[in-house]
Design a protein with these regions (language model features):
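Membrane-anchoring hydrophobic helices of lipid-metabolizing enzymes
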Residues: 1-115
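Generic alpha-helical secondary structure signal
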Residues: 1-4, 39, 43, 123, ...
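Hydrophobic (often cysteine-bearing) scaffold residues that line and stabilize catalytic clefts
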Residues: 2, 60, 120, 147, ...
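Short Gly/charged-rich anion-binding patches and loops
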Residues: 9, 43, 99, 123, ...
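A non-catalytic, amphipathic alpha-helix used as a structural packing/dimerization or gating element
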Residues: 28, 42-47, 59-66, 70, ...
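Non-catalytic C-terminal accessory region of glycerolipid acyltransferases
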Residues: 36, 62-65, 103-105, 130, ...
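Catalytic core of membrane glycerolipid acyltransferases/transacylases, capturing the structured
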Residues: 107-166, 189-196, 203-205
Length: 281
């Protein structure tokens, strides 16, 4: 209940302050949270050291602080969903390689939109809607129903159709057969170790089977995309070339193909990778 009230208070504050002041307030509370968040500091430090084994503790700490601050700004943007419109998208968002979206849809086999807990993946769905592309996203439900409804109401207020994790398989397959776009977060398996084991930054971890599994079953293309925050708090939506499975692909080999792309972006923007839990096996 406390977390829900904090979200509601944060939402109210953000909706009544200019964006610049909302960000400043978010950074202040992020720094305060950082002091007391022992587990979050521990997990993020371990994850960053796995990616950058040669960096000093001071360098890791600097990245980690920026990560906490960026995540706080991510929440500000998410709370502001009801007032984000096409004017905002036009002013604050640049889309790179937009042609890859049409290229993927032209195959008429559906598109698995593959992203990560990087930058602002939630805003990515809103941008696709603003560009005129119907969009479905698989979301992990919160244990607290009020928090779950709070998040989903904001997603759906901007045309992002939410598919609850646990009920996703049949609906995703059906949507892909209708040449729709289905978004999945591909950098963390939430199915109690039922994912596929892959090497990620040279260490074993579980990644979800969903993106590769759906692509292999339907012939859908996997379209990697990442909404990255820029230093001036604008965004760039980076689209990568669609990945098409070949006759020899398995879930493991196809997962490795897009895992390499996620590695590249996470390494380039580690201060925007919000993995506040143990990642590797």
């Amino acid at each position: 209940m406390l977390n829900y009230l904090l979200y509601k208070i944060g939402y109210w504050v953000v909706m009544h302050l200019p964006l610049k002041f909302s960000y400043a307030l978010a950074v202040f509370f992020s720094d305060l949270h950082y002091v007391f968040a022992d587990k979050d500091r521990k997990y993020t430090s371990g994850n960053l050291k796995a990616i950058f084994p040669d960096k000093t503790d001071k360098e890791i700490r600097r990245i980690r602080i920026r990560m906490f601050r960026n995540f706080a700004k991510y929440l500000v943007d998410f709370f502001r969903f009801p007032i984000i419109d096409e004017k905002y998208v036009s002013r604050y968002v640049t889309v790179k390689n937009k042609q890859y979206i049409e290229q993927a849809l032209s195959k008429k086999k559906g598109v698995v939109m593959l992203t990560a807990h990087l930058g602002n993946w939630e805003l990515g769905g809103l941008v696709f809607g603003a560009l005129g592309y119907p969009f479905w996203a698989v979301a992990l439900p919160h244990k607290n129903k009020k928090i779950n409804d709070f998040f989903n109401n904001r997603r759906e207020s901007k045309g992002v159709h939410v598919i609850q994790f646990g009920k996703a398989a049949r609906m995703c397959l059906s949507l892909l057969k209708e040449n729709k776009m289905v978004a999945l977060v591909g950098d963390k398996d939430y199915s109690n170790e039922a994912g596929v084991v892959v090497d990620f930054f040279g260490r074993k971890t579980y990644l979800p089977k969903g993106p590769a599994g759906f692509a292999l079953k339907t012939g859908a293309l996997i379209l990697p995309g990442f909404m990255i925050r820029n230093p001036d708090d604008t965004y760039t939506l980076h689209m990568e070339k669609p990945i098409e499975s070949n006759g020899g692909d398995t879930i493991e080999t196809l997962t490795l193909r897009y895992a390499a792309i996620m590695e590249r972006y996470i390494k380039q923007y580690p201060q925007q990778w919000y993995m506040f839990r143990q990642f590797w096996i």
